[in-house]
């Protein structure tokens, strides 16, 4: 304390109080303080000390009265709060004096469960009025069981003795009240439950002795136990003998129309009434036991249940009204004759005699005779299921229908000619055929045959449909229909119902395919697609092990586009291949030989140069599959790019060692260390960084470090111990293939094992041929091609596919048969892919005119055609589709022109030429022929053509914004005096009037004037008058937004 000032926290220590309590005392004394560190004067501190002492004294006295323990810090505030609590105690004491708890003794155990005595006594206040026994008891009773719901059964069992204690004032009402108060839902049906109680006692004696005992138990616990469980148990026990004793039911049903006395009715009406009563009992289970606790109505419920199900099935629609009336009044007597009418039309079903070929008059007589035995044969319709809608109109067809079942069993071995039009119906009728087969066979044999055929077709489709399919990736709707053996329209329908509108040629992803399979109950298993670069067959077999010799390594140069792969190969070969490539990019696989002197010995390396463009993925994978070593070229100034990553994955999938050539180190922005860092993310760590990957910085243009690169390649080849058997017939892979107008089919073959000679008979894929000539990479003719050499082969009958494996055969007949078998398989698969079915045509007709672009693609080599077709598949084809009529290697011929003219197609030529007379034929037929030598340009033009087929979309283009500053009444309407804030206002443009941020009108600007003269448009910064025919409710401050609708060409985005 200094200068007569005291801090709050010092005072709290002195008084042994909390800061909060001291601040509360300051508030009571109106002493202005902000926090515990505030200072007060000595006089104010003295006042606080006095108040604190008084507060402590009152606190002690309050503790003595209450006898409760509390913490010292909280005592002052609690003491203040306990003062108003005293009157509460007095009220509680006053409540105890009258002791009105006699009627509420049942509540006492529940109330005593509460922990706090004060709360329990306060809860006892409401039961004081329960003497009237009406209003307070009902809120009080349900409140207790709502907490422990499962205890309701035990509580109801404990309650009867309680009610016995309370029965002195009202012996008859007390048990009903206790029972009704527990479940509130039972209260409304009380009047109904009282009526059947009288017949209750009459019915059980008519039943077996076991039922009498159960009925007595039911009577004892009938009124207090109003739950849904016990009456249901009684009902089940009584139902069992009733089901077994069906003969007893039948005569009672017959008595019903005659005996309709109100007292005996409840017991006998139970037979016909189950149809309406059953739904009501099931609908509100809690109330049903109170009504039917006696066991009278539920007793025939089980047999009646099936009768109820059969009644609407076997009767015409008019009987539905009878059922509706029945459901409205449960015990109404006039409804029972309706039920008899309901039963009468159905007996023809049991009258099964051999009368199906008799005329209608005789059938009517049979029906009349059958009416006498309606009740006896009422059980037969139980066989019918709940398919009411299938059999609602089966009045006259019943007797032939039963014989139809036997015919359907006999006929399937003799199917009639199938009708394709009925196929969709077969799939739709899959579920009801077995049950609904009685309905179609009405009067003519043709109907029966039709349905037999339908069932036969359905059985065939079910047999063909697989239970489990395996997919490796996305499929088109058409491909998926082949895999699942269902019509493609069925798949489109399933997806449409799921909210996805798809076309026949649209690609479906794996989750969507799984969804379709789930709907069709076909298990779809997804298997990871095998890497294209994986080596499928081992060229060197066990029989070659004794004759192996060292062979040159096959090295594939891979990497991103424009990273210098071909330039690097040029520098090694001392040639200019890159200059000859169109657009400066490689679009083929090139195979080249390089002679290298290593350790004083001449050695050879075979290089395969692969394209880096993304469209040539298959080519890169093919290169990795046949290679021994992969040289990954990465530009030092560009780093790792998408195709670099893809090349790494191809090489790793093929299991070949990777040598990294970091190119363009002579450029200014070169960062070889950054390239090494990026490559470590893909498992390639440089040797100088402690890894195993050889990385050589090179400059292709200057020729730096090329010798080091070649030396490293030969070292890796030595470690791999590459060998082959040169003394056997040749085996290998087709690197590239094309059709030459002078030479015919030409294929570049890489021999991986054995030796190829001129005159050998070989099969490459589906192409058969005899080697007429071989040319090496420098254009020289050779007679022998040893392992690891790449040569161009002439003499094949057809152009093989790039990536096919070839093999030399000694027997020409064997080779021809193998080639023809493969050709047949390819032709069949091609037909399946390109087929146009009636279902697809009908689907296209439903969608409207389907826009499609017909293309004929001719390329120089098979690999380029494959790459272009793969790239075109990436273009989305939801609204516009590409229809590839022909895609092959070779020059453009007159046959291609004729096909294009007939199908209105565009011919795309890629690095190819015209055959003689083809160009003139194209001009005469008006066929559009486009020639390309760079794949970029080809893909761009095709995408532009597809976008041109799309309907242009209307886009809103804003023109300006105008503010209304004055309103002038003119005649009946009004004119807005406006100021153009931005843009411009154009007459007859579309406008939107906003007021307070909300659009109040949209329309057309009819009148625009400036200085009392009509104006075509008014620019920003000028004033004008605006008038509209349909809008005159102008207010100053309104904003007019002007805009116009313009057509915009739609674009397609390439899917990845």
From Swiss-Prot:
SUPFAM superfamilies attached to this UniProt entry: Initiation factor IF2/eIF5b, domain 3, P-loop containing nucleoside triphosphate hydrolases, Translation proteins
Biased composition (Polar residues): 109-120, 151-173
Disulphide bond pairs: none
Region (G4): 663-666
Region (Disordered): 60-88, 109-359, 406-472
GO MF annotations, alphabetized: GTP binding; GTPase activity; translation initiation factor activity
Compartmental location: Cytoplasm
Region of interest (G3), residue spans: 609-612
GO cellular component: cytosol
Biased amino acid composition, Basic and acidic residues: 182-197, 231-250, 446-468
Annotated spans, G2: 584-588
Main location: cytoplasm
Domain of life per record: Bacteria
Region G5, residue ranges: 699-701
Domain tr-type G: residue ranges: 550-723
Alphabetized NCBIfam families for the sequence: IF-2 (TIGR00487), small_GTP (TIGR00231)
Protein name: Translation initiation factor IF-2
Lineage: Bacteria, Bacillati, Cyanobacteriota, Cyanophyceae, Nostocales
